[in-house]
């Protein structure tokens, strides 16, 4: 669901309101709430060769009732840290974006490293761990191939 505003000229703005629609009075009254994540899709062929490089990022949405100390980590099925996402700690609705890559994961490409590509994770189950003032909230992400 999108809210779209446009002018008769060239301007247009589209806002994805799906997460906003999930903000209930119970969510607003909570210290923190972690919504179901958007899985994303890895490129066919891992971003190498004929499969192409198109992929969809994964998104983690969360609500904070008040300003808080926040961290957001992606873990693999074994509980090992895969990536740490930038996470805002101000009160309100937040979205964090994961490029489906491993932390520090740019791989060199042809051209002396000029063309860099992400070190994509493999398809499978991952866990987003949101820590708010020392309390953990978890949701599952399952990125697959395009």
What are these regions (language model features)?
Residues 140-146:
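Short beta-strand edge segments in extracellular beta-sheet folds
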Residues 81-119:
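Glycine-centered tight-turn motifs at strand-turn-strand junctions
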Residues 45-55, 104-118, 146:
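Disordered, low-complexity segments in secreted/periplasmic proteins that are enriched in proline
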Residues 53, 65, 89-91, 119-123:
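Surface-exposed coil/turn segments at beta-strand junctions on protein surfaces, enriched
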Residues 11, 104-108, 131-139:
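Short acidic/polar inter-strand loop motif in beta-rich domains
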Residues 71-75:
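Beta-strand signatures of extracellular beta-sandwich domains
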Residues 1-48, 55-67:
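Beta-propeller blade termini and top-face loops
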């Amino acid at each position: 669901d999108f809210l779209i505003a446009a002018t008769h000229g060239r301007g247009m703005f589209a806002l994805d309101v799906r997460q906003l629609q999930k903000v209930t009075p119970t969510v607003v009254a909570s210290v923190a709430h972690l919504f179901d994540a958007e899985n994303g899709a890895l490129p066919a062929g891992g971003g190498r060769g004929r499969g192409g490089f198109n992929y969809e990022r994964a998104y983690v949405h969360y609500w904070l009732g008040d300003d808080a100390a926040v961290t957001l980590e992606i873990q693999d099925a074994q509980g090992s840290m895969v990536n740490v996402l930038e996470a805002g700690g101000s009160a309100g609705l937040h979205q964090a974006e994961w490029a489906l890559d491993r932390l520090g994961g740019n791989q060199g490409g042809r051209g002396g490293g000029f063309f860099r590509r992400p070190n994509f994770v493999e398809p499978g189950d991952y866990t987003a761990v949101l820590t708010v003032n020392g309390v953990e909230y978890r949701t599952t992400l399952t990125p697959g191939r395009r």
